[in-house]
Amino acid sequence: METNLSEEKQKPSKSQAQQRRQMENYEFSQLANELPLARAISGQHIDKTTMVRLATAYIKLHNIFGQSQRAYSSADYYYGSDSLWTNNHLDLLDGFFVILDRRGDVLYISETISIYLGLSQVEMTGNAMVDYIHEQDINCFNSALNYCDLNWPQMCNVRVKSSLTKRANKDAVRASPGYKVLRLEITMGPNTNTRMIACYPMPTPVLSTVTIPSNSFVIITSIDLHITFADEKAHQLLNNPFYPDSNIKGMSLYSLIDISDSEVISKMHFDIFNLGAYKTPYYRMILNQTSETFYVESNIFRHTSISSKQFNDSITFVSSIL
């Protein structure tokens, strides 16, 4: 008799628990439909924790850009809508785009992250950006994040986790397996609590596959930055024309840099051994060993090759003239 009464009491409680689960699943199903994800992604199974994380990030993003839209409305009336980021901007990026909140959590990251790093938009949204940055580069990243301004963007080169680095070229320096070097250009978002980051992957360090534009030149140095090779354009720009027999080969690269910008090269010289690749801001080089200078921006690679007879270690500069 007591057993039957106990079973009768359990039936309603089981029914109520089942009903709660059904209602919960329905609400999460509705939430999944509201998330602004690609169909291919939303069609996959996303666990409830991930759904809440994504929803929280998108609500924050909506609040930030909803306010900025209202703030910009009067300016747009006079200046047009070019003051706002549009999807067309993302199409022009040879990389991917990230928006962070004041704590450094990812509010938005473009889907092209999968092309360059093999990571997913769903995986990174709502998580801290520093969780994906090499521990030795976190201070550099945080410094750029804190000191950027709307009219004074910051740039840094950092190693970011990647699942696409397992098949590296045998001659490429792999100081940090599982990471890829990116150049980050960081600026303030619509308000002081957000940061917008354009992320560009460094070109391949295999020189034969690097396209050299007409306004660029190539210099190769030893690891102490003494020049071992310079192409014809580099000779035209850097040799002393009054001494036809002069040659920049064997000279220290530092002697060809404007002294005011030597810190740029000094920082690169230190970082290249950790990163293996580096993108500089604009700096000045001395034109034909005179008092005149010109601005360049350099993609720099450390390149090693090992054979049975020797070990070669060099640094290659592919510099574009402003």
Swiss-Prot record:
User: Which is a Pfam family this sequence falls into?
Assistant: PAS
Q: Where is this region: Disordered?
A: 1-23
A GO BP entry is: nematode pharyngeal pumping
Keyword DNA-binding appears in the UniProt entry: yes
Could you name the domain of life of the organism this protein comes from? Eukaryota
| Name the record gives this protein | Helix-loop-helix 34
Organs and tissues of expression: Expressed in a small subset of neurons, probably AVJL and AVJR. Expressed in the AVH neurons.
Entry GO terms, CC: nucleus
Q: Tell me which residues make up the bHLH domain.
A: 8-62
User: SUPFAM superfamilies, from UniProt?
Assistant: PYP-like sensor domain (PAS domain)
User: Ranges of Basic and acidic residues compositional bias?
Assistant: 1-11
Q: What does the UniProt record say this protein does?
A: Transcription factor. Involved in specifying AVH neuron identity, acting in concert with unc-42. Involved in serotonin-mediated feeding behavior, probably acting by modulating expression of genes involved in glutamate signaling.
Assembly and interaction partners = Efficient DNA binding requires dimerization with another bHLH protein.
Query: Which UniProt keywords are listed?
Result: Developmental protein, Differentiation, DNA-binding, Neurogenesis, Nucleus, Repeat, Transcription, Transcription regulation
Residues forming the PAS domain are: 82-152, 203-276
Q: Does the keyword Translocase apply?
A: no
Q: Output the SMART domains linked to this UniProt entry.
A: PAS
